[in-house]
């Protein structure tokens, strides 16, 4: 089965056609897509799962169900989920403000939203540390609220929010820009309150893009490493996330455990994204 991954798609097309000829445009594009998808996505995932499958079941379960690993699973997914919920709310508000209002500094704010895309994640982590450490600019506020951000779970949450916010804003903005304001005005003329107008007129068309943005943001938060490793203490049972745990295993040359943990994370993440995509499809069908 493994050698099939290395057979060029255009050769398979030749064999099925039974004779040599030039590829059509569709077949050429299909061959390129199969090559790209196979070698960039399918092949690495296949071999990761294949290496994991070679391990005995008792070793798989023992490694995947270690207390430290379970704690990292739970903390990573719960923190990413909380960051996604926060970004869904405030990302929607930010996108609304950028589309519907004019104010000084709007272009600067709009450009700043894309910074997490361009910045190395380690730079993002260093930026967060500079602002939120014990000697940072907001130390008086943190002292008044009696909270510690750096080297604490709150720091991990902030890092995940920082890297995943642009996904929500950028997926909602085009929908808001194409939305006709006449619908809102008509609803107001008929006596609808602002909340009723938003919930029944504006929110339904925004739902697919909001779900897409939050799904992408959730995926990005799950895989974040560079900023978290700087702003968190990375202590097991406290604020250790899966990505940092995997790196620690690799530093210890424990490749077997790292492979097993990565495979379980891959399966869990794929399952979560599968159900989220199902919800998206259901929403689109429902609104049609």
Curated annotation (Swiss-Prot):
Keyword Oxidoreductase on entry: no
Molecular function terms from GO: ABC-type sulfate transporter activity
Localization per record: Plastid, Chloroplast membrane
InterPro entries with a match to the protein in the record: CysT_permease (IPR011865), MetI-like (IPR000515), MetI-like_sf (IPR035906), Sulph_transpt2 (IPR005667)
Keyword Glycoprotein appears in the UniProt entry: no
Function: Part of the ABC transporter complex cysAWTP (TC 3.A.1.6.1) involved in sulfate/thiosulfate import. Probably responsible for the translocation of the substrate across the membrane.
Transmembrane segments: 2-22, 28-48, 77-97, 112-132, 149-169, 196-218, 227-247, 257-277
Membrane topology term: Multi-pass membrane protein
Keyword line: Chloroplast, Membrane, Plastid, Sulfate transport, Transmembrane, Transmembrane helix, Transport
Source organism of this protein record: Marchantia polymorpha
Pfam families: BPD_transp_1 (PF00528)
Domain ABC transmembrane type-1: 73-277
Designated name of the protein: Probable sulfate transport system permease protein cysT
Gene3D superfamilies linked to this entry: MetI-like
Similarity remark: Belongs to the binding-protein-dependent transport system permease family. CysTW subfamily.
Biological classification of the source: Eukaryota, Viridiplantae, Streptophyta, Embryophyta, Marchantiophyta
Cellular-component GO terms for this entry: chloroplast membrane; plasma membrane
Gene responsible for this protein: cysT
